[in-house]
Every structure is written in structure tokens, then in C-alpha cells.
């Protein structure tokens, strides 16, 4: 009986302390404030390039090669292209590498590719701004011609190559070299003979870089290897 009485007394003491605490609290005290949401710093590595005759823009960000963000929206607001990025599903496995990867954005028809285009990119815990130099002769909107294209990005020597084909047989760049005063060659790895390719047709974009062509206009890219046999395409813009 003694042990039970001590336990009962302990419970009464705890209840008394709780009541005392409630009585001493100020009924009109200041409400708890939520912590301020921090705005993420602008990504210094964000890049951009014109592609597909002006129908697409490739955005370059750093991150996992297997978890590339997708563009949800792209709207021209007061002369600024505002792009919203969506991250892959939380349960999607992501490699732990840190590489430049490309998010493709459809260009609104009211954008004039001949003029410099400020781009603002936002997403979950992400923000970046970049200015894309204008390129004449490009036209946004309309249907793609499914031909390869390339555009200089905003980082020095960096460019994006866009090809079309199977989503499971994406061409892999093995080498890039300047092969002339206004020419570079992109070499792709050979496709394994036993590789199975789906019959879909999707855009496939890859980031590459080359030295020695800064400031050179009208550079041609020669695509070799894989399904390409010396295909020549212009690189939109000028290398930084």
C-alpha cells in the first residue's frame, strides 16, 4: 500500500505543476511566429542555349545525371522568360554524380530570338538568372523538323547538342575537338550491337565543351559516330 500511495502522490504533484504552469502563462502573450522562408541564392552555373531553330531553349544546371529537372511552365512576363522547374519524384533513385545536364524548354511564340532574352528559373529550393544572347534567323513555335541542332551556352566554350531518336538509346559523346578555324567535331560512342532501342522519338540533349573558338562566329559542328556520318550543323550564337 505504501508503494501505491507514493505513486498517487507523485501524480498529484505533476498535475499541480502543470496547472501552475498554465496559470502563469500570459493569456494575451505574443503569438508564435513562423521562421522566415529563406530565398535560395542565384545559381552561378545556370546556362542557356538556343536549339531546334529557336523552338527550344536548353537550360544547363549542375546535379545528378539521372534526375534531371523538367520544365513545368515557361511564360514571357515583361520581357523576361520565367521558367518553373519540377524535380523528379521523391522515390526516383538518383546517382550521386555532379554533372552539367540539360532541361529543355519550349519557347513561347511571343519571344524574339534575335533579341537578348533574360531568363529567370525557379523551383523547389532553386533559383537562377541568366541572359541569353539573341541570334538572328531563329523562329519559335511550330513543329520541329527532327533534325540535330546545337547552340552555344553562356559558359565559356560550352555548347549543347540536340538530337532526336530513341529514349533508351541516347547517343553518348566520347570526344570533342576543334578541327578548323570555325569548326569542331563531336564524336559519339558506338552503340552496342545487343542494345535494345525503343521506337519512340524524343529530344536528347547533351552538354559539351571545346577550347579555342571563343568569339568565332558561324562555327560548324561535325557529328560523327553512332548514327551520324559527318553530319554538319551550325552552332547558334557565339562562344563566350
Describe each region flagged by the PLM.
Residues 1-10:
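Bacterial N-terminal signal peptides that target proteins for export
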Residues 17-21:
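C-terminal motif of bacterial Sec signal peptides marking the signal peptidase cleavage site
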Residues 23-26:
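Bacterial signal peptide processing site
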Residues 45-75, 149-175:
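Short, surface-exposed binding/anchoring microloops in extracellular/periplasmic proteins
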Residues 74-88, 176-190:
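Short, aliphatic-rich beta-strand segments
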Residues 86-102, 188-209:
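An anionic, turn-rich surface loop/hairpin at beta-sheet edges
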Residues 108-110, 120-167:
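Surface-exposed beta-loop interaction hotspot
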Residues 109-129, 210-237:
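A short amphipathic beta-strand at an alpha->beta junction
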